[in-house]
Structure formats: structure tokens, C-alpha cells
Design a protein with these regions (language model features):
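SAM-dependent Rossmann-like transferase core, predominantly class I methyltransferases
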Residues: 76-140
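S-adenosylmethionine
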Residues: 132, 171-276
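N-terminal auxiliary segments of SAM/dcSAM-dependent transferases
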Residues: 2-105
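Conserved SAM/SAH cofactor-binding pocket of Class I
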Residues: 117, 121-202, 206
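Conserved beta-strand segments that form the floor/walls of ligand-binding pockets within enzyme
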Residues: 5, 95, 110-114, 129, ...
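Generic structural signal for residues in well-ordered beta-strands
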Residues: 32, 65-69, 96, 111, ...
Length: 276
């Protein structure tokens, strides 16, 4: 299927780029790139782009913007990503790069991600926050769950840091296939990537670490299951929401016996760490 590319230039860019990505992700767009001027958003052909944009912050005022869109034939999708995909560095301890980059410039742990439509290349603030948290963990638990795994980058980092069994789940078939390919690219053998939702976890034994980089509403809907699946003393890392949502999520999590440990932010985005 052909893909619609919507190029949105913003003046100023921040914090509106992150807000737009969050809003458009709930309006039919399933791929994003940050550019120097704003963002590129991608959706399947047939989406009413004009109607979707009317439901975002674009028309609330306070900043200037320009919107351009074009149709990308399906066979050109990867070429488009390759043209825009740049390496991501996390505190000089982690490099997220594509195979076509100059890998000799990697700093710290090198993770290779073949850019496709799946979310999670490290460019978005939430993926960066989660990646940083994994790099900074003193000891990686044996069993890790990655919900909304996208490209599989977090699952791959977890294995490279010592996890012995990682379950990566995403609702999108394309994301699951991408995660499997990226696991193979990084010579990972301990990752099981499955397509589905929280229902797949009914018979799973507890995890020492659960990662969930989705959005606030889904996180709240899944919270009881995260609490059930987390072993005593285990860690839950949540992201995919704004700094303004932190108190709401922390208060909600305490209802299920989860204790607040820490919060980290990047621009307007946040990640919270909880323990059972």
C-alpha cells in the first residue's frame, strides 16, 4: 500500500514537535521522523489528513507552521527512511545506528537498527529516555518484558546488558517482523518477538523488568497486568507520555501496589521508574 508523507515545519519547533507526534499517533499516523524544522508523519493512503490535522494543536495558535504532503509508493519507503535516519547517541555510552552509517563512529554499546515503519529508533525522546535507563541499570534482570516493542531496540539493549530471556510484544505485525530482523542483525538469540496485546501474557511467569513505551491511556489500561506480572522487587519503566501526566500515572500505579522510584524528562516527555 502507498504511504502518505506529511511534512510539518514548525516555528518554533519545540515543544510542538513532540506534542504533534503524540496527537497524530492517535489519529491514524503510525510512523514519524523528527527533522531540523519539525516532523514528518506517515500514514496509509486513504487517511483524511486535513481532518486529522484539525484535531491537533496546529490550529490552537502560538506558533507558525507549514504543511506539505506527498504520496510515497510502497517500494520507496525504506529509501525515504535511509535518507533521513541519523545516528543516535546516548551519553556516549550507547549508539543506535543503521547498517549504512559509518559504524566506526559508534560510542559505547553499538545497536544496529534497520529503519522501517516501526516506532523506536532512538530519535524520539521517550525511546531515548528508556534506552538511557537500560544503559544505566547496574544489573539487568534475567527475564524482561518489552511491551509496544516497535523496532525491538529496547529488547536488544536488554539482551546486550545481560538479560537471558526477553519477550517483545507489539500489536503491529510489521513491528514484530522488524524486531525479529533487528534482533538477528544484532546477533541476539534471547528475544522472542510476538504480535498481539496484553492478552498474550495470561500464562506468563513473572518478569524482573517490564518496559512499556506506549501512551498514557494504554499504560493505565495495562497497569493491573504489569503489577501482576512484575516479580517482587522488580522494576517497571513507563514512558510515552508528557511530564504533565507523571502525577496522574504515579497515583494510578500506587493502586496496584507499585511504588514510585524516579522520574526523568527530555523536553516535554517523561519516563517514570516504579518498583513492586
Amino acid at each position: 500500500m502507498n504511504t502518505i508523507e506529511v511534512i510539518i515545519d514548525l516555528r518554533p519547533k519545540e515543544p510542538w514537535d513532540g506534542i504533534l507526534i503524540a496527537q497524530l499517533s492517535e489519529l491514524g499516523f503510525d510512523g514519524f521522523l523528527e527533522t531540523r524544522q519539525g516532523i514528518c508523519a506517515y500514514a496509509e493512503e486513504g487517511l483524511n489528513v486535513e481532518e486529522a490535522l484539525k484535531q491537533t494543536c496546529l490550529y490552537e495558535g502560538g506558533f507558525e507552521f507549514e504543511v506539505h504532503q506527498k504520496l510515497i509508493p510502497a517500494q520507496n519507503w525504506n529509501a525515504q527512511w535511509e535518507a533521513d535516519f541519523e545516528p543516535v547517541y546516548v551519553d556516549d555510552r550507547l549508539s543506535i545506528m543503521a547498517p549504512f552509517h559509518d559504524l566506526s563512529k559508534a560510542k559505547g554499546l553499538l545497536i544496529q537498527i534497520q529503519p522501517q515503519m516501526s516506532f523506536g529508533t532512538g530519535h524520539h525522546q521517550t525511546t531515548w529516555l528508556m534506552s538511557r535507563a537500560l544503559i544505566n541499570m547496574s544489573q539487568m534482570p534475567d527475564r524482561v518484558l518489552d511491551m509496544g516493542s516497535g523496532t525491538g531496540v529496547l529488547a536488544i539493549i536488554a539482551e546486550k546488558r545481560g538479560a537471558k530471556e526477553i519477550l517483545a510484544i507489539d500489536i503491529e505485525e510489521g513491528a514484530t517482523e522488524n524486531a525479529r530482523s533487528n534482533a538477528e542483525l544484532n546477533k541476539c538469540s534471547k528475544i522472542t518477538a510476538l504480535q498481539g496485546d496484553i492478552d498474550l501474557l495470561k500464562d506468563e511467569k513473572p518478569f524482573g523488568l517490564i518496559l512499556a513505551n506506549i501512551n498514557k491511556n494504554v499504560l493505565k489500561a495495562h497497569m493491573s497486568e504489569y503489577a501482576r506480572l512484575l516479580e517482587p522487587g522488580g522494576t517497571l519503566l513507563l514512558s510515552g507520555f508528557f511530564e504533565s501526566d507523571v502525577d496522574e500515572l504515579v497515583d494510578f500505579a500506587t493502586k496496584f501496589g507499585l511504588q514510585f522510584v524516579d522520574v526523568n524528562t527530555n523536553e516535554t516527555w517523561a519516563m517514570i521508574q516504579l518498583k513492586k
